[in-house]
Regions:
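Glycine-rich nucleophile elbow surrounding the catalytic serine of serine-hydrolase chemistry
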Residues: 26-36
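Surface cap/lid and interfacial helix-loop subdomains adjacent to catalytic sites
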Residues: 6-23, 36-156
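Core alpha/beta nucleotide-donor-binding catalytic domains of modification enzymes
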Residues: 1-3
Length: 156
């Protein structure tokens, strides 16, 4: 696992870098981690009139795309009070408006209470950036993420 200092040291070795483009992807809790990682990375950047820059080399950086599938930010055992220190606070799940494009695929028929989805729209139902899309698909959480094998589900 790299720290931000490791990333900065690696960048110093490549003096021909003109711009850093970042895209993140994830399903379920991985989508929550993609959102949190992107925010943590953005908080390490400096912002000016030209956009974002990163590291001691002030490399221009752009967060191009976030592809997330049915974000679930709950960690640990459902319906327990165990504190596992793996919960996110509200700002970790907020998608920064400087992300150029975001697509979030969401399960429309999830019934399990342990899989609450964290939508990308604000509380008022509006999406912050017109280049972002939240698409609802029929099925449950693992239908969206591809976890069920064909023919493994039955109606009874």
């Amino acid at each position: 696992m790299y720290s931000f200092a490791d990333v900065d040291n690696s960048l110093k070795q490549h003096r021909l870098i003109k711009k850093i483009n970042i895209s993140t992807f994830g399903f379920s809790r991985g989508a929550a981690l993609a959102r949190a990682f992107t925010n943590q990375f953005m908080w390490q950047c400096e912002s000016d009139c030209n956009g974002l820059s990163y590291g001691t080399g002030k490399y221009p950086i752009e967060f191009k795309f976030m592809g997330i599938f049915d974000t679930v930010a709950s960690f640990g055992l459902p319906a327990t009070s165990l504190n596992n220190n793996l919960t996110f606070d509200g700002r970790d799940m907020v998608i920064d408006e400087r992300i150029k494009m975001c697509v979030h695929h969401v399960a429309g028929n999830e019934l399990r209470f342990a899989f609450p989805v964290d939508l990308i729209h604000k509380g008022n139902g509006q999406i912050a950036n017109p280049n972002w899309k939240e698409l609802v698909y029929p099925g449950m959480h693992s239908d969206v993420g591809g976890g069920y094998t064909p023919g493994s589900q039955n109606v009874n």
